[in-house]
Amino acid sequence: MERYKCRFCFKSFINGRALGGHMRSHMLTLSAERCVITGEAEEEVEERPSQLCDDDDDTESDASSSSGEFDNQKMNRLDDELEFDFAEDDDVESETESSRINPTRRRSKRTRKLGSFDFDFEKLTTSQPSELVAEPEHHSSASDTTTEEDLAFCLIMLSRDKWKQQKKKKQRVEEDETDHDSEDYKSSKSRGRFKCETCGKVFKSYQALGGHRASHKKNKACMTKTEQVETEYVLGVKEKKVHECPICFRVFTSGQALGGHKRSHGSNIGAGRGLSVSQIVQIEEEVSVKQRMIDLNLPAPNEEDETSLVFDEW
């Protein structure tokens, strides 16, 4: 019961319709009072004598205008409150009736009532509506332009950053590769083919070329080893001493064999100490001739034998 209560006389009513009829009576009385107040103000202005001083005229006009404005503002506020109460009561009644008749359409009716209430409220508080409507559109267009510009700028920056990152990655990959491999790759690559510089063979992929180069490296290693062995052998042969007998000019593989051979010459020389030098030379020549002769009855001597066979008849 407290909900349907008049704000002016504080009377309570059963429903909103009864309260609305009661509020209309208040509105009629208020409008009559407003007409009376405005009529009195006009009469006072007309009956005002013209011979008063300027100061008195100013003060009275200010007082009357201020009182008139105050009364008008008060009446406007009362009208707004009454109309707001009427709209609220009508909304409540329509909601209750719609819920009883058709509860499924409650949402749509509520939205319509809210829209009508907003429209009435805008009518009551109209103060340059065209300006109020035009300003948000201006702000929205500006915001749209700014957002589009920001998006375009962001896309440009992202594309630049991505390009820089790709460029840095490529530089890192190139730095990781050795200079030798990169030079070989560039020189060997011709029209999508990979050519070996040493033998001139062409391969379809860089991996095949790498395997082929490995074989070349192995061959080079073997060649270097054989060359080293040959050089060492030649140097060793040059460095070896020649063990040659000064008497019979026979060559021996070692100094020990040469020494034993010289002892044989010394024994012969010692046995013939009484002989002359010419005889000794003659004997040595005969020995050398005998050594040169080959006895077919004897087996052939081995080349690896360090000692030489001396055929003595004595």
From Swiss-Prot:
Chain positions covered by the region annotation Disordered: 41-109, 166-188
Highest taxon, organism lineage: Eukaryota
Keywords carried by this UniProt record: Metal-binding, Nucleus, Repeat, Transcription, Transcription regulation, Zinc, Zinc-finger
Residue ranges, compositional bias (Acidic residues): 80-96
Family annotation (SUPFAM superfamilies): beta-beta-alpha zinc fingers
Locations listed in the record: Nucleus
Organism encoding this protein: Arabidopsis thaliana (Mouse-ear cress)
Protein name (database record): Zinc finger protein ZAT4
Keyword ATP-binding: no
MF annotations from Gene Ontology: DNA-binding transcription factor activity; zinc ion binding
